[in-house]
């Protein structure tokens, strides 16, 4: 199956690269309308995934990742329209000059070619990934999780129906409907067809892709995000930020999983936070010995807890004596995604932003803002936690490479 699908997307990538900006934008606008028109059809297929998930006893938080409602489908359509309105990076000239030999040298943006996307649970990723790849002249091979197979299949069917209506080869998007681990590993090693592979999901998925892939990988997604509440923090502000980052949507990668508190304010802040956060939703605190003394309820934290992406109403807590200790702790356990400090000390804020090794580092704000739309990129294909090629929310430019065009008049060397 991989051989067949890989050849289709590889062949289609040549046509995708030739599409004009107007053709791409018109198609994305029509696809947005089509999603809304097919809302009932999409919800009907999504219901099969939801029923299967509930039958397997999956938590409500994880079921919510699968769920497509009329509003979420409308949001997906809005995302398509926003991508259509973004500037097209393909063909953009980054630099141009004439060298001492008289050669005219131009560097411009070009598509990556064929993109492989392996992801879990969220069917909206199907639309996000396709829209960004299509806008940048790439073809894409998608492999979603078995838990969202019916949703992913109907979304790709709708995309393909619209491609055929627009007389664009439908090979610019293919879905690996065999969700077995064996087929996934074949996809990870399909380097004769795929130019890049982007995994988006759990730490287990991403680590498996890194271990097995021969296709170049852009690592995304694992979000063990931490908030440090400094001794000078406004405790009301800190409480609001932590509650938002932990409870607003705990199943996403930019939710806070860990809290670090300065010892000088721990006895005042931790009881206040625990009281206020439990009014929103009961949260389990997994805390070190010092933090437990300030909490009315909690369980002892293990080292593993400080590096864990819970994706649930669970928060690890660490009390530290100073900023340096906080930075050391965060850099030790961080997934390099998003970290935040709540402080009124300008120098501590600057030191934190300078020394924390993460894609996004906040001062006095929730980690929940790490998102392609918020950062002005439109939809995102993922949030890269590595440093090569792309880092942070990956928008259109992250799905491009560059090419040098050199014009001469007989020069030799």
UniProtKB/Swiss-Prot annotation:
It is an enzyme of class 1 (oxidoreductase). Keywords: Amino-acid biosynthesis, Cytoplasm, NADP, Oxidoreductase, Proline biosynthesis. InterPro entries: Ald_DH/histidinol_DH, Ald_DH_C, Ald_DH_N, Aldehyde_DH_dom, G-glutamylP_reductase_CS, Glu-5-SA_DH, GPR_dom. GO terms for molecular function: glutamate-5-semialdehyde dehydrogenase activity; NADP binding. Its main location: cytoplasm. It comes from the Bacteria. CDD domains: ALDH_F18-19_ProA-GPR. Disulfide bonds: none annotated. It catalyses: L-glutamate 5-semialdehyde + phosphate + NADP(+) = L-glutamyl 5-phosphate + NADPH + H(+). Catalyzes the NADPH-dependent reduction of L-glutamate 5-phosphate into L-glutamate 5-semialdehyde and phosphate. The product spontaneously undergoes cyclization to form 1-pyrroline-5-carboxylate. Belongs to the gamma-glutamyl phosphate reductase family. This is Gamma-glutamyl phosphate reductase. It comes from Lactococcus lactis subsp. cremoris (strain MG1363). The gene is proA.
């Amino acid at each position: 199956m991989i051989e067949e699908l890989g050849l289709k997307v590889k062949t289609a990538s040549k046509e995708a690269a030739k599409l004009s900006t107007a053709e791409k934008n018109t198609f994305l606008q029509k696809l947005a309308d089509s999603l809304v028109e097919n809302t009932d059809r999409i919800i009907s297929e999504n219901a099969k995934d939801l029923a299967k998930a509930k039958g397997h006893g999956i938590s409500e938080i994880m079921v919510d990742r699968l769920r497509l409602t009329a509003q979420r489908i409308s949001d997906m359509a809005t995302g398509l329209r926003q991508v259509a309105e973004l500037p097209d990076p393909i063909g953009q000239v980054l630099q141009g000059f004439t060298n001492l030999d008289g050669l005219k040298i131009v560097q411009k943006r070009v598509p990556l070619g064929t993109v492989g996307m392996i992801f879990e649970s969220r069917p909206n990723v199907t639309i996000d990934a396709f829209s960004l790849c299509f806008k940048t002249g790439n073809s894409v091979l998608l492999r979603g999780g078995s838990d969202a197979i019916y949703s992913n299949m109907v979304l790709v069917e709708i995309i393909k129906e619209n491609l055929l209506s627009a007389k664009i080869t439908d090979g610019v998007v293919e879905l690996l409907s065999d969700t077995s681990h064996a087929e996934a590993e074949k996809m990870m090693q399909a380097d004769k067809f795929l130019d890049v592979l982007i995994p988006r999901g759990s730490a287990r998925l991403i680590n498996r892709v890194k271990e097995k892939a021969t296709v170049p990988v852009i690592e995304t997604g694992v979000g063990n995000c931490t908030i440090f509440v400094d001794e000078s923090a406004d405790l009301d502000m800190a409480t609001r930020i932590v509650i938002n980052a932990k409870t607003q949507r705990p199943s996403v990668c930019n939710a806070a999983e860990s809290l670090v508190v300065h010892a000088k304010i721990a006895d005042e802040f931790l009881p206040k936070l625990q009281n206020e956060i439990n009014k929103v939703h009961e949260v389990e605190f997994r805390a070190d010995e010092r933090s437990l003394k300030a909490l009315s309820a909690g369980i002892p934290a293990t080292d593993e807890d400080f590096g864990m992406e819970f994706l649930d109403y669970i928060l690890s807590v660490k009390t530290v004596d100073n900023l340096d200790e906080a930075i050391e702790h965060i850099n030790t356990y961080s997934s390099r995604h998003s970290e935040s400090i709540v402080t009124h000390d300008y120098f501590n804020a600057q030191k934190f932003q300078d020394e924390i090794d993460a894609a996004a580092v906040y001062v006095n704000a929730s980690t929940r803002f790490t998102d392609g739309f918020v950062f002005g990129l439109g939809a995102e294909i993922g949030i890269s936690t590595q440093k090569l090629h792309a880092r942070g929310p990956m928008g259109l430019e992250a799905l491009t490479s560059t090419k040098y065009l050199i014009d001469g008049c007989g020069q030799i060397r």
